[in-house]
Amino acid sequence: LDSLNIESTVAFDVTGELPSNLNHLPFNLISTPDKDVYKTTYVFDCGSSSRLGKLESLVLNSEKIVVVDHHIDPTFGDLQIIDPKAASTTQVLYRILIEEGLSITQEIADCLMTGLITDTGRFQYSNTNSEVFSIAADLMSKGSNLSSISENIYGSIELDALKLQSKVIERIELDRELRFLHSVVYQEDYSEFKTTPAETDFLIDVVRLAKESDIALLLKEQTDGSFKGSLRSRTDFNVQQLASFFDGGGHKAASGFSSDLSIDEIILNIKNEIRKQI
């Protein structure tokens, strides 16, 4: 938008510090919205307005809302540019930039590459196809350093976060019949291990590694006592349907939700939903 001389405000609702493993991204562009109504608002990678947090009312008051996503059936937006087969929303955005003949700088390429790397699990998930590799190659030709970005995201973790990882692993409970496992991060863990919620985003990818499970859940306690859940699937099992039970969303292999229920109630409901699918 800057290259087109279009005035814009970049906003992102986040609680606490942004994750340090994403410091290579231009977070300096993020600012606090200073208008009550915006003419056009673009929303990326968000299937439900409820997931916009404090920005929800501001976005919904916009004259026009454009949703760019790879999640199925977003519940809001005047214009929806969606491809549920895309591995990442950045894959959809890349196509838009190319089709419109817009320049992709190294800084833009790094942002797009980050989305590809994280949403494909370093190009390991089943959503990784030939187009993903073609886009990654083009982004590298524009100056994006795949190796450096991948190392920054996955190869460098604070020691305290590693210590918390061991605690989360200790808490894992496995239902062998359903091939479902889950663990939890409590609020007190953040103070005990001197970490922030943003620094624990990688933990779901640790929990999902157990070969005895097909479905993994990591619950994170929020300051108000509610829980945010991250779901992952290692097979064709559709965890989006599990998330939708709690009015959450995502896609087949990875989804999320929020709930005011207790841990036991959340687990019971998820197990019941799993039984309906198998």
Predicted features along the sequence, with ranges:
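N-terminal small/polar loop signature for handling phosphorylated ligands or for N-terminal nucleophile
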Residues: L1-N61
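Hydrophobic helix-and-loop "lid/oligomerization" segment in the mid-to-C-terminal part
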Residues: L1-S20, V37-Y38, T118-I278
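Hydrophobic/aromatic beta-strand patches that form the interior of the parallel beta-sheet core
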Residues: T9, T40-Y42, K64-V68, L79-I82, ...
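Short, hinge-like loop/turn segments at secondary-structure boundaries
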Residues: P26-I30, L60, I82-A86, R234-T235
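Short glycine-rich anion-binding loops that position phosphate/pyrophosphate groups of nucleotides
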Residues: C46-S49, H71-D73, Q187-E188, Q222
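Short glycine-/acidic-enriched loop or helix-start segments at secondary-structure transitions
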Residues: R51-L55, G77, K228
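Short alpha-helices
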Residues: V68-I135
